[in-house]
Amino acid sequence: MRFFKHLSYRTLFTKAVMGISVICLFASDGLTVSATTIKEENIAYNQSLAVQSNAVANWPTGPVISAESAILMDADTGAILYAKNIHQKEYPASTTKILTTLIASERCSMDEIVDFSYDAVHDIDPGSNHIAIEPGEQLTMEECLNAILIRSANEVSFAVAEHISGTTWQDFGDIMNERAKELGCVDSHFVNPNGLPNEEHYTSAYDLAMIGRAFFANEALCKMTMTHMLHILPSERQPDDIMEVNKMELIPGGKYAYPYLVGCKTGYTDVARSTLVSCAEKDGMKLICVVMKDENPNYYEDTIALFDYGFSNFQRVNISQTETKYNI
């Protein structure tokens, strides 16, 4: 069995690229400002931001949440039920991987063999999520997609990007941007397949929901996100028994397990903060929820609050062409 050593480090300065000033963790008098204090201040500020859908006349009032931007969308029609800064450019972190894996599922068969180059393995940031694959080893595409969606493995994302582009993982960015445009995205620019920090890699709550409409329509990908354990058996292509637990708390057995969940993907970097894109279905209505620049565990709580708001206040009805009114 392969054991993993995951490095962790604390960033002393967070550079805000999108109009937010640099936050320093040292007070001028020499006292340290705690991360908890900064987190609480971020939450309080985000909760004070306007929810644009609440300004619509006779629209059900949506919940106050701690995400900087968020959206609740009907998956089938694209109707927006809740809107909070939905076109604001945000860093997606690992929620990027729903686009990467969607493209892979559309372009590749699950039994294709993916080679791991030196660059794919070593271009990831220290301490970022990985499964400790070595250069020269191979996995099937199905194993790769499971590793990406269950473990959020960054080196696997690079390898899949190289496999699809036929060259370098950097060239995969053009493929991502082309597909995002086809899906209706209007605020995004992608430069890597895993969401590792880059000022030129951004999206919005609206765009993630649009990508989510295609991603969550794929039953195989949804099933992967809901799988409790990543288990890759040793083979002639790689020698180790790889096992990793899915840490997603919305899935069955999680602390915030949501009974109507269809699938989900989290993301986190110091700048992006906590992001989450998810889908739930109840009584024939399928909703997609995106929360961005949130905090942990608030992003779980906010997601549940938004799903509950949607299922409690809206329903889909079929209206005959001969009818002019429909009473609910």
Report residues per predicted region.
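N-terminal secretory targeting signals
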Residues: M1-S69, V317-I328
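A short, sequence-level motif marking secondary-structure junctions
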Residues: V17, Q88, N146, I251-P252, ...
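An N-terminal domain-start capping segment
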Residues: A16, L25, K97, K247-I251
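Hydrophobic alpha-helical segments and their boundary regions
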Residues: R10, V17, A67, D125, ...
